A protein has these predicted regions:
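Core segments of cupin and vicinal oxygen chelate
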Residues: 7-53
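Residues within well-ordered alpha-helical secondary structure of globular protein domains
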Residues: 31, 83-86
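Short, low-complexity cationic-aromatic patches
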Residues: 5-9, 47, 55-60, 104-106
Length: 129
C-alpha cells in the first residue's frame, strides 16, 4: 500500500538551519529554548532539550538546511521509501545525525531537503516535564 507521510506515522523530529554565524544562532536558541548546545565540529552545532532538537550549520542566513521527520516504526519508514520510489523521486542519503542508518532524504519541488528515518535514542541529559 502506498502511504503518505501522515499515514506512515511521520512527525517533525528536528530542524537544521543555515547561518552565516552558526555559533551565535545556536547560542541564541540554546538560551531562548533552554537547550544544551554542543559544537561537534567547525561545521555543526546541535541544540538539544527534552522533546526538541535543532542543528545549525554554516550557510546562508534564513535558510532551512533540512527538516527531519521521524517515523514511528520500520513498517512506516519502509512504506514511505517505497512510495517515494514509485513516485520516481530521487532517494538521497540522509544528512541527519538523529536517525538510524536506514534513513533517507528527498528534495521537494523548491529544493528543500526532507529527511525520513527512525529516531535514535535521545542523548540529552535535561529532565522533561
Amino acid at each position: 500500500m502506498n502511504k503518505t507521510a501522515v499515514q506512515a506515522g511521520a512527525y517533525l523530529h528536528h530542524l537544521a538551519f543555515e547561518s552565516s554565524n552558526p555559533a551565535r544562532l545556536a547560542t541564541f536558541y540554546s538560551n531562548a529554548m533552554d537547550m544544551d548546545v554542543t559544537q561537534l565540529s567547525h561545521s555543526e552545532w546541535r541544540c538539544e532539550g527534552p522533546g526538541r532538537r535543532m542543528i545549525v550549520v554554516p550557510g546562508t542566513d534564513k535558510q532551512l538546511a533540512y527538516a527531519g521527520f521521524a517515523c514511528r516504526d520500520q513498517a512506516g519508514l519502509t512504506a514511505l521509501r517505497l512510495r517515494a520510489q514509485q513516485e520516481g523521486l530521487e532517494i538521497l542519503d540522509s544528512p541527519s545525525p538523529y536517525f538510524q542508518p536506514d534513513a533517507f532524504a528527498l528534495c521537494d519541488p523548491n529544493g528543500q531537503t526532507l529527511c525520513f528515518g527512525l529516531a535514535k535514542l535521545a542523548q540529552n541529559h535535561r529532565a522533561g516535564l
